Each structure stands twice: as C-alpha cells, then as structure tokens.
Amino acid sequence: MSRYRGPRVRIIRRLGTLPGLTNKTPQLKSSSINQSISNKKISQYRIRLEEKQKLRFHYGITERQLLNYVRIARKAKGSTGEVLLQLLEMRLDNVTFRLGMAPTIPGARQLVNHRHILVNDCIVDIPSYRCKPQDFITIKNQRKSETIISKNIEFYQKSKIPNHLTYSSLEKKGLVNQILDRESIGLKINELLVVEYYSRQA
C-alpha cells in the first residue's frame, strides 16, 4: 500500500487529531458522533484497525513500512508497543518535525528529500534514517534552506519541544539527547492495539 496523498481533513475527521499529518483540527458535532456510535456496534477488529491507521497516517508511512517496524520491535528487548513508537519517533523526518523545523511530518520529509537537513554535518536525504542519541540536526548552509526553516520555526515551534530533543536558536541546531520515553509521544494512541492488530502478520 502506497503512502496516502489524499485529503488530510477527511482522515482526521475519521481518526481524530493527527498533528504529524496536519495541524488542522476540524470540529465534529457531538450529535453526529453520538448518532454514529449508537447506530454502529464497533467491533474489536475495527478499534485495532483504527489505532493502526492513526499510527500510519500520523507518521506518513506505508503499510509495509509499519509492518517492518512492528517486526523489528518484536525482536527488540522491552515492550513491543513502546519500542515501536520509539522507532517511529526517531525517524529523521519526525525528529525534524518535532524540532519545529516543519509544520507537519510530510513537510519535514520534503525538507529531507530536498537535502536541506544535515545530521552530524552530513547531508541525509533519507526520511527513514534512524536518529541516535547525541546526533545533531542542522540546516544546510544555503540561504534558501535557512529561509524556509527559519520561517517554519518562527510559526510552528510554539508547542514545547519534547524532553529527548533540544534546539538552539542561536546555533540553529537540534540535538537528540536520548531515546524518548512514552510520555513524550506527540500522539494520542494505544500502541498495544496496534501490536494486537499485527499479531498474526508479524
């Protein structure tokens, strides 16, 4: 399944707020929500499916990519669900987004693809690159790159940067301090339901 490129508002109306996908938060009428809940008996499969879809759309990854991350998480030590979230959060496109360098993860992915982002002073144009503690993220030393990202930071770095990251406005440098903990995840998600969804596939 390819990466979703359709209307983003339609997705968040169905799944709820997904800050990685879009910064829009459409309001739903409570009467329509109550009516839809009363008219449908939501199955456990659907609940697990929707949690999986939240994860996929928020991080902007394909079905195959998400399944691969689940398989990696299963082989790692610790809680599979928590490791899965850590793997997704440490992607370069997501780290760029969480530092406030882009308004959304798709926007951050575009910056990475267009070679605006450096990791440890080396250009990295792979959005799925897995960042590690002590990696530092900087902007390519070109006026176009600096202009784009400076504008993004001015408008989108309003929310608090998570504890596992820091950003120096003076040096225009982001730093990965550590692997993030569960409380720093920027998405309302029940990752255990995602693991259950893939229990027969991974």
Swiss-Prot record:
GO terms for cellular component: chloroplast; small ribosomal subunit. One of its GO terms (molecular function) is structural constituent of ribosome. InterPro entries: Ribosomal_uS4, Ribosomal_uS4_bac-type, Ribosomal_uS4_N, S4_RNA-bd, S4_RNA-bd_sf. SUPFAM superfamilies: Alpha-L RNA-binding motif. CDD domains: S4 (cd00165). One of its GO terms (biological process) is translation. Keywords: Chloroplast, Plastid, Ribonucleoprotein, Ribosomal protein, RNA-binding, rRNA-binding. It comes from the Eukaryota. It is found in: Plastid, Chloroplast. Pfam families: Ribosomal_S4 (PF00163), S4 (PF01479). Residues 90-153 form the S4 RNA-binding domain. PROSITE patterns: S4 (PS50889). One of the primary rRNA binding proteins, it binds directly to 16S rRNA where it nucleates assembly of the body of the 30S subunit. With S5 and S12 plays an important role in translational accuracy. Part of the 30S ribosomal subunit. Contacts protein S5. The interaction surface between S4 and S5 is involved in control of translational fidelity. Belongs to the universal ribosomal protein uS4 family. NCBIfam families: PRK05327.1, rpsD_bact. This is Small ribosomal subunit protein uS4c. It comes from Hypnum cupressiforme. The lineage of its organism: Eukaryota, Viridiplantae, Streptophyta, Embryophyta, Bryophyta.
